[in-house]
Amino acid sequence: MQKATYYDNTAAALFGGYSSYPGSNGFGYDGPPQPPFQAATHLEGDYQRSACSLQSLGNAAPHAKSKELNGSCMRPGLAPEPLPAPPGSPPPSAAPTSTTSNSNNGGGPSKSGPPKCGAGSNSTLTKQIFPWMKESRQTSKLKNSSPGTAEGCGGGGGGGGGGGGGGGGSSGGGGGGGGGGDKSPPGSAASKRARTAYTSAQLVELEKEFHFNRYLCRPRRVEMANLLNLSERQIKIWFQNRRMKYKKDQKAKGLASSSGGPSPAGSPPQPMQSTAGFMNALHSMTPSYDSPSPPAFGKGHQNAYALPSNYQPPLKGCGAPQKYPPTPASEYEPHVLQANGGAYGTPTMQGSPVYVGGGGYADPLPPPAGPSLYGLNHLSHHPSGNLDYNGAAPMGPNQHHGPCDPHPTYTDLSSHHAPPQGRIQEAPKLTHL
């Protein structure tokens, strides 16, 4: 036994310098790392240890000498460790083992018992950490290659709570990939779970279910999990991600419609303005209304027909119901009502709405007491069928044609105008006349 320890000790003492000196440079991997300040004392300490071990083994010295040898061996090595070296007075066979253990602890990288145990424990600890991480990566690769497996790292052990939190994070941030599967949470290594790759059949079923209702009740979720060979949690997270994606799509559609919206939505006000003002079917003829001739037209008729002033209040009453304020119609209508109201408002036309040359259709005029009230005897003989709405009504020989001649174009253009919205219901009656 002494020979075996002797050979081990001498080998450790002689070759310890060579095995531990690269360790100080960082290249040795036989044992635990050494502090750098021992690098200069390794060679001297190893030779002194070899001498100490040879002397102690060869001479079988008494206890005091072995204690001195222990102290001399420990001085170049680790300074704070001579206390456990001389406990009591061991027998001479125990002294060299204590020196060898101390020398091994001082020198470090040798192949005897205690350092090997320490290195083994460290290696087992590292093996407990690193291969576990390798396994998690391999399982993630396996999951990506073979989808449909429901077990993940986050579901096992103590990672359940962290996995739940990760599910919330994935539902918040992983909306873009809702069709593709779950997002792995960015955080803790303890609850790393792999991205679930769904098959096309699973995605079709999930999309179908999402199409019918976006929120899934728990019994239906359990049924879907059994049907698709997924876990409830995966289906829940898929639905969360899919809802986020749906919300994003709706936002994008809303922005697109609002950006393209003003052109179609802004175009209807143009016909609305035309209905409120003119109801013009031929937009190219609207500039003819800008001519200042209608007031002269009305005044000429006033002079020709010699309408008294008491005729104006009922005509103003007729013009009052028009609530639309566009300037051409409101400016021209009172004059034309004053001018043409008596001309076309003959008793033969009382049953139909009266067409007024300038501004559209007015209500039927109140029946006059007689044709002679306004001096319109010459118009009492004309039936309503002879009236055309181009301003060229058949006129009696007493009538002055002068003021009427320059303006047939104005009245012709006015015939294309439909009534204001208040009188729309009366329009078809006159179109058939």
From Swiss-Prot:
Q: List the disulfide bonds.
A: none
User: Per the record, a Pfam family?
Assistant: Homeodomain
Q: Does the keyword Ribonucleoprotein apply?
A: no
Q: What Gene3D superfamilies does this protein map onto?
A: Homeodomain-like (1.10.10.60)
Which InterPro entries does this UniProt record tie to the protein? DUF4074, HD, HD_metazoa, Homeobox_Antennapedia_CS, Homeobox_CS, Homeodomain-like_sf
Please give the SMART domains that the UniProt record associates with this protein: HOX
Chain intervals with Gly residues compositional bias: 151-182
Which residues fall under the DNA-binding region feature? Answer: 191-250
Q: Which GO terms describe its molecular function?
A: DNA-binding transcription activator activity, RNA polymerase II-specific; RNA polymerase II cis-regulatory region sequence-specific DNA binding
Q: Where is this motif: Antp-type hexapeptide?
A: 129-134
Ranges annotated as biased composition (Polar residues): 139-148
Presence of keyword DNA-binding: yes
Compositional bias annotation for Low complexity: 95-104, 111-121
Q: Which family does it belong to?
A: Belongs to the Antp homeobox family.
Q: What is this protein called?
A: Homeobox protein Hox-B3
The organism that produces this protein has a lineage beginning with: Eukaryota, Metazoa, Chordata, Craniata, Vertebrata
Gene coding for it: Hoxb3
